[in-house]
Amino acid sequence: TTKDGLTGNYVRAIYEDRSGTFWIGTYDEGMSRFKDGKFVNYKETDGLYNSGVFAIEEDAAGFFWISSNRGIYRVNRTELEDFAAGTIKRINSVGYGKEDGMLSTECNGGRQPASFRADDGKFWFPTQDGIAVVDPLSERSNPMPPTVVIEDMSVERSPVDFRNGIKIEAGKKDIEIRYTGISLIKSEQIKFQYKLDG
């Protein structure tokens, strides 16, 4: 229960990986890892695509495929372990929905089994509008970070030309920079990091 450290009491999935670690999914409170008698919890605020975890399947490359009310999402088990060890602060997950061919993003998970691994390695997940079949071998990833493009910039709500470099006087406030990333794969899920220097 939550008194013992579990992320939520409404458990929807329990998966034991090949090392004997238990991964426990909840209705809407995220996922817990149970290892060596201790819980580590993962939520949307930590990088999960959704806090619903109805079923967990693992592919040969070490990725978890998880069904939820927002579709199916994929997360690297190694990243989950690194997060638990404190070596990273955020998990990367990729969501799949109607734009990827699902008829409904609302997966079913109130009963077991909420997923099925076929002999060909594909995963079957029940949804409100039929079955969603995932082939992990057909997953296309983009190993190169997308090119970041600065679209415009303003200082104290006035547009400034930044193309040849810019110096901002001391005391100026409200600096806004609009930027985007260019990618043809899952562009709506690009995550940015930034750092102010100086």
State where each predicted segment sits.
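Surface-exposed extracellular loop regions of Gram-negative outer-membrane beta-barrel proteins
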Residues: 30-35
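Residue-level "micro-hotspots" composed of small/polar
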Residues: 3-15, 27, 40, 44-198
